[in-house]
Amino acid sequence: MELLIVIALIGILVTMGVASYSTAQVKSRDARRKADMKVIQNAFEQYYSENDGDYPPDASVESDSAYFPGGFPKDPKPNPYPQYDPDYDSTQALYCYCADLETDGSGNADLDCTNVGSCTTCGYYCVRNLQ
């Protein structure tokens, strides 16, 4: 009888540990996505300052090692669809780049980004032009 109680307690503790670990992993990946968005924003602002006040017109800048020496940031979790969604402006006056976070409601997509719309409860975290 005592052995069954001990086994049940161990099972409960293991279940709690696994759930806590999974939550920590999700938070860690979301933090990485937010940091990646800042890297992208900094690179685009550098592009702006070096190109007569124009932002990139398309995704070609993503492969430019001058702006992304370590390579363009990739989502920390392999996904069959892109987690990082760009929204370029053909007039080169603005940009918006968003990451789809795993934790809904933790984004800042109330920014006016046409690729995700105005969404205050979804999990998109966006950066946009600073100029």
Which residues does each predicted region cover?
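Active-site micro-motifs of SAM-dependent methyltransferase domains
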Residues: 11, 23-26, 46, 103
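N-terminal single-pass transmembrane signal-anchor helix
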Residues: 1-21
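Membrane-proximal N-terminal amphipathic helix
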Residues: 26-52
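Short, surface-exposed interaction loops/tails
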Residues: 91-131
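Extracellular/periplasmic head regions of type IV pilus-like filament subunits
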Residues: 45-105
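Short linear motifs centered on Gly/Pro in flexible linkers and helix caps
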Residues: 26, 32, 60, 106-108
